[in-house]
Every structure is written in C-alpha cells, then in structure tokens.
C-alpha cells in the first residue's frame, strides 16, 4: 500500500529507520533514548523496522517498546508514519509519497528482496 502525506506550511517531518526495538543488538535499548528525535518535528516517518514484530524470541519485548515509543510520539504531538520493513512486515504501508511524490520513502528490503527474502 502507498501512503500519502502532504505537510502544511510550518510542519516538519523527520525520517528514521531500523531502530529494531527488542533486538539484542539494537543501539537504542529503551524508547526514551530516542526522545530527542521528537523535538522540532510534527511527523516522524519510520522507514521500516521500528521493532521486532515477526515471530521471534524478541517479539514481545519489541512490541512493548514499540507501543511505548508510539505513545511518546502522541504525547509530544508528533504523528508517527510507519512503513513496513522486513522485521515489521505487518505495517500497512510499504511506500510513502510525500508532497505529491516529490519525496518517496521506503525500507531497503522493498527494493532488494534478496537481502531479506522473508520480508
């Protein structure tokens, strides 16, 4: 699915990807470590793999931290825009068209299926 987003004057989007909440090797262990990303933006575009939502030993932890992070976004008045990655394939949108298609965003596995055939 393609999601579209048009920012109004004064709105700002920030882009991140591959946070991997719940994974043992994630650089950010707790959602609160990423609170600084919510400053100065109205939308946070996550280009895949916010957390480990596929069935795995770290799924429960990933889902819990994902929920906490999304609540942090809402509390800060930031609208999260979630795109599917190969570790969170259940997200609805796989591609974001921003500003009428002048900017597009997606997770890398969407272009190169061979790097993540399970995604």
Task: Say what each PLM segment does.
Residues 2-101:
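Core catalytic region of metal-dependent phosphoesterases/phosphodiesterases
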Residues 19, 105-109:
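Histidine-centered catalytic micro-motifs
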Residues 108-119:
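Active-site-proximal loop/helix segment associated with metal-binding centers of metalloenzymes
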């Amino acid at each position: 699915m393609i999601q579209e987003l048009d920012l109004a004057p004064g709105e700002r989007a920030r882009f991140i990807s591959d946070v991997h909440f719940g994974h043992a090797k994630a650089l950010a262990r707790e959602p609160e470590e990423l609170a600084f990303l919510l400053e100065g933006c109205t939308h946070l575009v996550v280009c895949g793999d916010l957390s480990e939502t596929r069935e795995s030993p770290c799924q429960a932890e990933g889902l819990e931290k994902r929920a906490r992070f999304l609540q942090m976004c809402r509390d800060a008045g930031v609208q999260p825009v979630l795109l599917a990655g190969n570790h969170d394939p259940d997200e609805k949108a796989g591609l974001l068209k921003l500003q009428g298609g002048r900017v597009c965003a997606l997770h890398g596995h969407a272009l190169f299926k061979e790097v993540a055939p399970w995604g």
